[in-house]
Structures are given as C-alpha cells and as structure tokens.
Regions:
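ABC ATPase "signature
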Residues: 231-232
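Conserved ABC ATPase "signature" region
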Residues: 114, 118, 125-143
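Catalytic Walker B motif of ABC-type/P-loop ATPase nucleotide-binding domains
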Residues: 172-176
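A short, surface-exposed alpha-helical micro-motif characterized by mixed small hydrophobic
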Residues: 213-215
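Helical segment within the ABC ATPase nucleotide-binding domain
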Residues: 187-199
Length: 285
C-alpha cells in the first residue's frame, strides 16, 4: 500500500511531462536517513547519469522510483504515472537491469531472456524471437545455450541488460551497468544504449565513473547525503570544469593525502632519476 501523505503544494507537484519526476522522496532505515527529500526531473529522451559517493542514496532512489521499495514520503512519477498509485502501469514502462546475483544462474542465456519476456506477459514465441534479436545484438549468440553461471562478468551484464529490454520499455534504469565490464563488452553496451536513446527512449544510469558519464550522458545529477546537490545538462553541472573535479567540489570529497613515512618507493628521499628520452623517430628496444 502506498504511504498516506498530505497534499503537496502546486510548486512541489511532479511534472507529468517528464520521463521521471521525483518530489520530496524520503527513506529511512532505522536511524539512518538514506534519501532525504530528494527531488529531480529527468527529461524524456535523455541519457541521464546519477553520480555520488558510496552511501549517497543513489541505489535506494532507483529502487523506489522503479516500484521495488516503498518510500516513507514523497512521490515518484514515471511518464505521468504515480509509481505507488499506479505501480503496474509504471513498471510496464520501465526496464530495470537486474544485478547478477538476482538472476537464475542455471538457466542458459536464451532461457533467461525468454523467461523475462514471459514474466512481462509476452507469448513464448514472441519472447523467443525478441530474445534471439537481443542476444545477437549483444554478441552473445555463441553463448546463447550456455548456462549464465559460466558467463564472464561482461557477458553477464549484457544478458542482464537484455532481460531489461525484452518488453521494449520507454525508460531503462541501470545501476552501475559498466562495473567489472571489459572494454569490448562496454563498447557494445554503450552502442546499444545510445541507439536506444536515439529512438526516443530514456536511459538512467548510476555510475562512479565520471569520465564515462561525461562522455555518454546528456544530463547528470550529483547526489550526496540523500539529496540532489546539482542537476542539469552535463555542461551546466560541470560549469566549465572537468566533471570529476566539479563532483569533488560538490561533495567535498577531496582531502589532503597523509604522508606515509615508510612508503618512499626505494629512493631514500632522493628525486627519482629522469626517464631517458627516446629521440623522435627512434624505436626503443
């Protein structure tokens, strides 16, 4: 059952024109406030990055806006549908990539994706046809009939993403989709996500990799201590600086490094010898 709340003033109402509109989202676990009145608008057709330090509230926010966790306060709206008043309609519009530990490892890749489609109410034949297309797109055809437990980390992330896309959602929500993924698999995933956005879809990712967010995303929100401290286009949030440097300024994450007396690299306090320079055109052997 959705939490009972007092009516919001007009200025705090979510924006139904947005792909995702969050107002005053709040969640507490015991004495710890995980999400503290968080508000955010994610435009339709954007590639939106959520960044923040560990424990900032990103994953808790994602879990609430996708209908898997009941908030203690606030509201989340998906393309005009209130997540907790119309949860089934909201979930139909969302593709949430499961974490590797949340899938059935003894199913083959093909079985897993077909199963995900059938859970969404698709006939088996349609789910199988779509699964074949997705597996080919993710370059997993040779592994389609291998159990997922025997997949590499990159292959597992790709098959998890395929299960999120099987029902052709309007919004993809991905928590750390590139974590532990090799460069080849990462490039494959990026290409598919960018193509999806070009068709009008919306992608929301959480990530710790600032360079990836700066390169891929159109928009970014910096989350710290359960609140959004900056949001907008990547250029607006970066404000003329490197995004990682701006992030550190916003969350107060840079601290002076303590000198470790015994960690001297073997130079006994002497400057390191200069690295010999190779003359232009000469190949060092």
């Amino acid at each position: 059952m959705a939490p009972v709340q007092a009516p919001m003033p007009p200025a705090m109402q979510p924006n139904p024109a947005m792909a995702v509109s969050i107002r005053g989202l709040f969640k507490r676990f015991g004495n710890k406030v995980a999400v503290n009145g968080l508000s955010l608008d994610i435009p339709t057709g954007s590639f939106y990055g959520l960044v923040g330090p560990n424990g900032a509230g990103k994953t808790t926010t994602i879990t609430m806006l996708t209908g898997l966790l009941v908030p203690d306060g606030g509201v989340a709206m998906i393309l005009g549908h209130n997540v907790w008043q119309d949860v089934n309609a909201a979930k139909r519009l969302i593709g949430l990539m499961p974490q590797p530990e949340q899938i059935f490892p003894t199913l083959t890749g093909m079985q897993l994706v077909v199963y995900a489609g059938m859970l969404r109410g698709m006939p088996r034949a349609e789910a199988a046809a779509r699964a074949k297309d997705l597996i080919a797109a993710f370059d997993l055809t040779a592994a389609a009939n291998i159990m997922v437990r025997d997949y590499s980390a990159g292959m597992t992330k790709k098959i998890c993403l395929a299960t999120a896309m099987i029902h052709s959602p309007r919004i993809l929500v991905l928590d750390e989709p590139f974590e532990s993924v090799d460069p080849v698999s990462s490039a494959n995933i990026k290409d598919i996500l960018v193509d999806y956005v070009h068709t009008g879809g919306t992608v929301v990712i959480s990530s710790h990799v600032m360079a990836l967010v700066e390169r891929m995303c159109t928009h970014v929100a910096v989350v710290n201590q359960g609140q959004v401290v900056a949001a907008g286009t990547v250029a607006q949030v970066a404000a003329g600086e490197d995004l990682e440097e701006r992030f550190l300024q916003l969350v107060g994450g840079r601290h002076g490094a303590a000198h470790i007396a015994w960690l001297d690299g073997g130079a006994d306090g002497q400057p390191a010898p200069a690295v010999p320079q190779t003359p232009a055109g000469e190949v060092r052997r």
